[in-house]
Amino acid sequence: MVAVTRLQLPVALIGILLASLLLLLVAFSGARTADATHRSGNTFQFGCDFVKTDRIDPFKDELGITHVHRHEVFGYRNLQNSSTVTALLNGANSCGPSFVKAAYWNPLNTDAGTRNMPRRLSVYYSGWGDVNKLVHIPRGAKLYGTDEDFRCGAGQARQTPPYGCKADEFRIRVHFPECWSGNGVHPREFVEANSGGCASGYEPIPRIRVAVHYRNSGGILRKPLRVSAGADRMENWSFMHADIWEVNRQAGFRNAIERCVFKSQNTGEPHTCSPPASNQL
């Protein structure tokens, strides 16, 4: 009996180990799925030239901000704290297609105390989930994104700054909420999807991502990467965010979204909608 017991014990242990390994694989698979939150379908994308750096935030009242920090502005060329939707619609814009009228802004950043100057902004509007359920972003939507990641040159996206990056440029990418309450344009009316879909009472809108392209000052990205916050403070990179004043409801933009985004992911994209090369994302 002792001999039998000695033979059965390893078998039992092997069974336990195999079960534990299976659980780990399932957990790992779930983590990989969660990391793929931003996977999107067909995309309409364009670029915007850098406009200016200023203490500007038209959303300061909605966000409860008392001390406006320095932001880098793209898109609408005359953005002020007092700007209006009408001003954006009628004003000059630095983005590629003439029908783009939105404004985009984000805090400036430094690495090891040296300012990193923005080269340009890339903007992406993408389909996701069941594209037949997507609705247009409401005119005047005030979108606030705090979900950021980083890329060094053509390298893969990562969740933390790519310190030591020696490419000519690095990017900070910000992802925006993709679910709308249907009840106005205040930043609180837009929330992130959960478990691959919008919560009850929310409608899915195109998934938006912006990528700010920066010159790699000094030829290498050094610690610490800090961003402007408050009146004259610089904070940890985790304070990074971006804002969009979305006024793109004119015919040209609507047509681009319907042609490039509001369609099944398994249909071919028109050439004008195709994503650029990987190192441009």
Regions found by a protein language model. Name each.
Residues M1-A36:
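Sec-dependent, cleavable N-terminal signal peptides
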Residues T37-V68, E72-V174, S181-L281:
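Primary mode marks residue(s) on the alpha4-beta5-alpha5 output face of response regulator receiver
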